[in-house]
From Swiss-Prot:
Pfam families: F-box (PF00646), FBA_3 (PF08268). PROSITE patterns: FBOX. This is Putative F-box protein At1g70390. The lineage of its organism: Eukaryota, Viridiplantae, Streptophyta, Embryophyta, Tracheophyta. It comes from the Eukaryota. InterPro entries: F-box-assoc_dom_typ3, F-box-assoc_interact_dom, F-box-like_dom_sf, F-box_dom. Residues 3-52 form the F-box domain.
Length: 332
């Protein structure tokens, strides 16, 4: 269909067609005409596109390439479809950067925050849009004000885990000045911090504990015991109470070859996802565990990077994996 034919279609039909396109294709359509750009960048289309993307969440892989030209490599793939982790013919994407290393934060509504010291970049892996900034205060996108606002937290602390977003709040594990583990909550609307009491003193974010999304709830989980296969968790319920849960995973020691794996959380199927904490010569492996069937599946990430340097410690000095990433039209 050429541009002239597309322009003659009713706007509702144009939106329906555009909803089926990838973010990369949508970027090209913003250059076709002002009308297309107006539709794609409109608030209604943003909401429709995001709602559709939520039905097919992805795993997002972010790797810092350390050989040759310094760059970030992104790859997204459907997380709940067979064959396991179907890439749907999407190719890895590389972004060249001058910094030696960027650390990515948990994606929120299709956007990720890349940090390197005081430098911050807001990036959309789909259309490859980004917005760099060297300030680290509060910034509200789309508010019309486009300004940073400084705020204070009465509890001095240092973030030590990834950030989770739930119902307008940001949750993250932290360490106090006295090296005590804390669970912090930041309300995006009120821009206020609060401290959530942890279930007990054994929860230490510097000693094998992590913050995860467990079936839509905030939870703290310890690394799986290599010998017993026990995954110990505390889950925060809707009443603000911590509930203890222990999941024993069969054949864990044989499957992991005595390696330590991080529990990353759950996906829509209810499966638990794990990734190795360290890797040297072998490619990182993702494990999926189904509590109902007791089935533990393996997937090697090497298969996704065939056209890039080998996925090992000498080629990439940091690999991060995020669950439930969705496509969005922000930053187009």
């Amino acid at each position: 269909m050429d541009n002239s034919n597309f322009e003659t279609l009713p706007e509702d039909l144009q939106k329906e067609i555009l909803l089926w396109l990838s973010p990369k294709s949508l970027v090209k359509f913003t250059l076709v005409s002002k009308k297309c750009a107006s539709i794609i960048r409109g608030e209604e289309f943003k909401a429709l596109y995001m709602r559709r993307s939520m039905t097919r969440p992805r795993v997002l892989i972010v790797a810092n390439e350390s050989t040759g030209e310094k760059s970030l490599v992104f790859h997204t793939l459907y997380q709940e479809e067979e064959p396991l982790l179907s890439s749907c013919h999407q190719q890895p994407m590389r972004i060249t950067n001058n910094a030696p290393r960027f650390i990515a934060s948990q994606p929120i509504l299709g956007l990720i925050c890349l940090r390197n010291g005081s430098e911050v970049v807001i990036h959309n892996p789909g259309p490859r849009g980004f917005k760099p900034s060297r300030k680290c205060h509060v910034y509200t996108m789309g508010s019309g004000k486009n300004s940073w606002r400084r705020f204070k937290c009465r509890k001095r602390h240092y973030p030590s885990t990834e950030v989770l977003c739930k119902e307008g709040n940001l949750y993250y594990g932290a360490q106090s000045i006295s090296r005590k583990s804390l669970l912090m909550r930041f309300n995006v609307r009120s821009e206020e911090f609060s401290v959530i009491k942890l279930p007990n003193q054994q929860v230490n974010f510097c000693r094998g504990w992590n913050l995860v999304n467990y079936n839509g709830k905030i939870a703290v989980a310890k690394n799986v015991d290599v010998d017993t296969g026990d995954l110990q968790m505390w889950v925060l319920d809707d009443m603000g109470e911590w509930l203890s849960e222990i999941i024993t995973i069969p054949r864990w020691k044989e499957t992991t070859n005595n390696c330590t794996y991080h529990f990353k959380g759950t996906i829509g199927t209810g499966e638990l996802v794990f990734i190795a904490r360290y890797f040297v010569d072998e490619s990182p492996i993702v494990l999926y565990y189904n509590k109902n069937t007791k089935n533990l599946r393996r997937f090697t990430l090497e298969e996704l990077f065939k056209d890039l340097p080998p996925l090992n410690h000498s080629s990439y000095h940091n690999i991060q994996i995020f669950l439930n990433h969705i496509d969005s039209t922000w930053l187009m």
